[in-house]
Amino acid sequence: MTIAVCPGSYDPVTAGHLDVIERSARFFDEVHVVVAVNAAKTPMFSEATRVDVIRRALDKAGCKNVTVSSTDGLITDYCKKVGATVIIKGLRQNGDYEAELGMALVNRKLAGIETLFLPADPILEHISSSIVKDVARHGGDVTGMVPDCVVPMLADALAEERQRKD
């Protein structure tokens, strides 16, 4: 059985993330989507919320061989714990490769875990969590960029953010 891990901050999960996860689920017996907690980042959504939203989106997509969880440790440690031999990362044309290559080499050196890069769907490659939040902050419509359940959550989170600033 081949087990893969798709790590990310998923703040929020986007249509591009889901595309990579769904495509990965076709190639591997088991895929673990891992919300990686990064102490250097201040997320908009809680760890539990991000896990829940991804689960709901993947249930709707019918992905039966995908597990969603989180970790605040090294992804390689998580991989060892679940027996994963591959880390999956989606790549856009915006410099993702350069950013991800160094991490892939470290992961292979630390734990012998390979990284498989999947190119983003050209229709989705412009979408990132940062862009989604920026568009929403400025009143733009993010429908289609994120799962349907994220749209109202994003509006609520931004309303709370504005109230804190006032």
Curated annotation (Swiss-Prot):
EC nos: 2.7.7.3
CC terms in the record's Gene Ontology section: cytoplasm
Single GO molecular function: pantetheine-phosphate adenylyltransferase activity
Organism domain of life: Bacteria
InterPro entries to which the protein is assigned, alphabetical: Cyt_trans-like, PPAT, Rossmann-like_a/b/a_fold
Keyword annotations of the record: ATP-binding, Coenzyme A biosynthesis, Cytoplasm, Magnesium, Nucleotide-binding, Nucleotidyltransferase, Transferase
Cofactors: Mg(2+)
GO BP term, example: coenzyme A biosynthetic process
Residue positions binding substrate: 9, 41, 75, 89
Site (described: Transition state stabilizer): 17
Listed pathway(s): Cofactor biosynthesis; coenzyme A biosynthesis; CoA from (R)-pantothenate: step 4/5
Top-level enzyme category: transferase
Residues involved in ATP binding: 9-10, 17, 90-92, 100, 124-130
CDD domains for the chain: PPAT
Protein localization: Cytoplasm
Catalytic reactions on record: (R)-4'-phosphopantetheine + ATP + H(+) = 3'-dephospho-CoA + diphosphate
Protein family per UniProt: Belongs to the bacterial CoaD family.
Subunit text: Homohexamer.
Function: Reversibly transfers an adenylyl group from ATP to 4'-phosphopantetheine, yielding dephospho-CoA (dPCoA) and pyrophosphate.
Protein name: Phosphopantetheine adenylyltransferase
Taxonomic lineage from the root: Bacteria, Bacillati, Actinomycetota, Actinomycetes, Bifidobacteriales
